[in-house]
């Protein structure tokens, strides 16, 4: 049992080209050969009275489910992937037959005749134009196949695994050079896997993950201050790596099979904190590739598919995060050539934000800020955003400093860009503070802003994602709602201390140390008063205490930090789903509507833990 680490709820098994979301013994989603795909099938155990315990296999991203009938163990299922190919394998050992219901939105074709007695097989065709998320769709015909050992059987839509040993292999067909070879590659890879030594594949899988864990570079002396530190490092590394695509983009959890800007930055920081520079580099390369392919940056982008997800004001906030990723990788590695080769991308990210400056302020993005979470009204989307403006100033300043240091831009160009940045910086305190109050928005921006007559986003009337028209009042309605309801612009100011912490995490805070400390102490008191969310009936975001802990470590002296260890304990206590974190918590527990096993929350919480432990470590 020492090599088996208990996990709760949903977890992921994946290698960048195939992924499976698993809960107990149930397969709740599986997809290949890329990550911007809908779930192809589910497989759910029919006997509801059986007990299933799930474990991650220490030293790898493999999982085992143990199935019991009362006190009697009746079987084990071990899930793992091929190290690189779009192949997932489930090995099954049972003392009696066990039945699972197979369901799929795509009609599975019986291909038993192709393999004769070598396998029970079902082929899935996912048509070009299938929805991935919202309006984002696949752009290629995709084939996947489920292969079962010949001693399995299928009856009336159920798969029966027999007593003894059996297996399930799920294969995705790579698209090939021209995007048209999925069927041929699915069939050839299926044939190859039926002849493969599955024990050898498992050994290669374990060796692959040992290599990843060996590459992790953290201060283990500092981490020794908490129990099971290695387990934590492994768990978060697995959560990030299994949800990072072969292209470099990262899904935002089981619900969202696209790569989102804000989420990508959190994961990037997690990789950097772990010393895993290669996946961090691939993330930046991926986003640069999206820009060079499209000429703009969508709100979220496909991985292995050209689809994208659009929202309002996609040229702000996320562009600040992307520029920070490029700079932080360059600063950490000293690879100036990496930045030099991507100056077209970097300049685009800078100028996209500059074009949105009004009175020194950048507006909100429609999906990556407080608006998407319902914390701030969407009708105020074109207000000045404190967080987006801070990101612009911080990222632009660092970029222009690098351009001057490494002679990446002419002095005249640097001067022109710097004038805009410094003007925004000079106005920041006036724009977003009033006495001791820090505001997340400033309505004055809209008085001079030239908002578009049409935009794509969320209707202020029916909340549908579609194309919108600006109303005489200044809000936005879809053609169906236009003229039937009003859409006034929200004109109040909002204050919440939580808005400060993301810009602080990104190294872009423009507030004084004293103001930061005052806000921190208010936040600390609130968290302790509601017992770290246990008495909070509303949602608490899953990264809240991690980002607070990170800010505490950044603002306070090491001698003062031990007084805030309760925040560290609260973060560790919140771990679920594979010893990582979920999207939202309510009354101290994961919210029912929360996306589980989240890369963003897990990465930020790990950054907070590492920053705190490094700051309090008294060793060499």
Name every feature range the model reports, one short phrase each.
Residues 297-300, 358-365, 381-385, 391-518, ...:
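Catalytic cores of carbohydrate-active enzymes
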Residues 215-235, 287, 292-296, 327-387, ...:
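Active-site acid/base region of carbohydrate-active enzymes
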Residues 257-360, 385-393, 561, 565-568, ...:
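Aromatic-rich carbohydrate-recognition surfaces in CAZymes
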Residues 198-208, 247-265, 272, 306-319, ...:
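Solvent-exposed loop and edge beta-strand segments that line ligand/cofactor-binding
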Residues 283-290, 518-528, 557-588:
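Active/binding-pocket-proximal capping segment
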């Amino acid at each position: 049992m020492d090599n088996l680490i208990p996990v709760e709820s949903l977890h992921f098994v994946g290698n960048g080209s195939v992924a499976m979301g698993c809960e107990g013994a149930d397969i709740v989603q599986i997809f290949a050969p890329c990550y911007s795909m809908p779930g192809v099938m589910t497989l759910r155990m029919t006997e509801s009275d059986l007990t299933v315990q799930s474990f991650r296999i220490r030293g790898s991203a493999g999982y085992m489910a143990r199935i019991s009938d009362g006190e009697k163990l009746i079987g084990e299922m071990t899930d793992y992937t091929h190290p690189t190919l779009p192949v997932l394998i489930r090995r099954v050992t049972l003392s009696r037959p066990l039945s699972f219901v197979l369901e799929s939105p795509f009609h599975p074709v019986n291909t038993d005749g192709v393999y004769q007695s070598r396998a029970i097989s079902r082929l899935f065709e996912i048509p070009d134009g299938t929805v991935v998320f919202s309006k984002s769709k696949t752009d290629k015909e995709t084939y996947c196949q489920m292969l079962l050992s010949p001693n399995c059987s299928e009856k009336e839509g159920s798969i029966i695994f027999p007593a003894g040993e059996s297996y399930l292999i799920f294969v995705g067909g790579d698209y090939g050079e021209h995007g048209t070879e999925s069927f041929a590659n699915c069939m050839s890879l299926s044939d190859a896997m039926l002849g493969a030594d599955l024990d050898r594949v498992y050994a290669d899988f374990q060796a692959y993950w040992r290599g990843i864990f060996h590459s992790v570079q953290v201060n283990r002396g500092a981490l020794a201050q908490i129990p099971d530190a290695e387990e934590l490092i492994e768990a978060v590394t697995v959560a990030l790596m299994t949800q990072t695509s072969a292209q470099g983009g990262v899904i935002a959890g089981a619900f969202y099979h696209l790569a989102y800007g804000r989420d990508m930055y959190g994961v990037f920081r997690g990789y950097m904190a772990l010393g895993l520079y290669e996946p961090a580099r691939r993330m930046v390369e991926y986003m640069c590739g999206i820009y060079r392919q499209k000429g703009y940056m969508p709100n979220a982008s496909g991985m292995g598919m050209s689809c994208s997800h659009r929202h309002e004001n996609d040229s702000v906030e996320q562009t600040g995060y992307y520029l920070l990723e490029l700079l932080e990788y360059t600063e950490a590695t000293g690879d100036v050539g990496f930045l030099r080769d991507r100056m077209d991308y970097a300049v685009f990210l800078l100028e996209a934000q500059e074009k949105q400056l009004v009175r020194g302020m950048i507006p909100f993005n429609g999906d990556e800020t407080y608006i998407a979470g319902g914390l701030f009204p969407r009708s105020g989307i074109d207000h000045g955003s404190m967080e987006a403006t801070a990101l612009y100033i911080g990222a632009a300043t660092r970029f222009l400093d690098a351009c001057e240091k490494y002679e990446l831009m002419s002095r005249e160009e640097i001067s022109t860009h710097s004038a805009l940045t410094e003007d925004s910086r000079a106005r920041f305190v006036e724009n977003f503070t009033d006495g001791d109050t820090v505001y997340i928005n400033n309505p004055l921006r809209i008085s001079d802003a030239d908002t578009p007559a049409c935009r794509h986003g969320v209707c202020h009337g029916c909340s549908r994602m579609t194309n919108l028209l600006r109303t005489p009042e200044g809000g936005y309605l879809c053609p169906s709602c236009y003229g039937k309801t009003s859409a006034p612009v929200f004109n109040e100011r909002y204050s919440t201390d939580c808005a400060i912490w993301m810009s602080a995490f990104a190294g872009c805070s423009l507030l004084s140390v004293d103001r930061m400390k005052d806000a921190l102490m208010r936040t600390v008191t609130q968290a302790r008063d509601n017992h770290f969310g246990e008495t909070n009936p509303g949602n608490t975001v899953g990264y809240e205490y991690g980002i607070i802990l990170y800010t505490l470590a950044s603002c306070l002296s090491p001698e003062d930090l031990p007084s805030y260890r309760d925040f560290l304990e609260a973060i560790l206590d919140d771990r679920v789903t594979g010893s990582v974190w979920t999207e939202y918590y309510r009354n101290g527990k994961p919210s029912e509507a929360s996306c589980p096993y989240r890369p963003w929350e897990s990465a930020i919480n790990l950054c907070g833990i590492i920053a705190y432990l490094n700051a309090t470590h008294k060793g060499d």
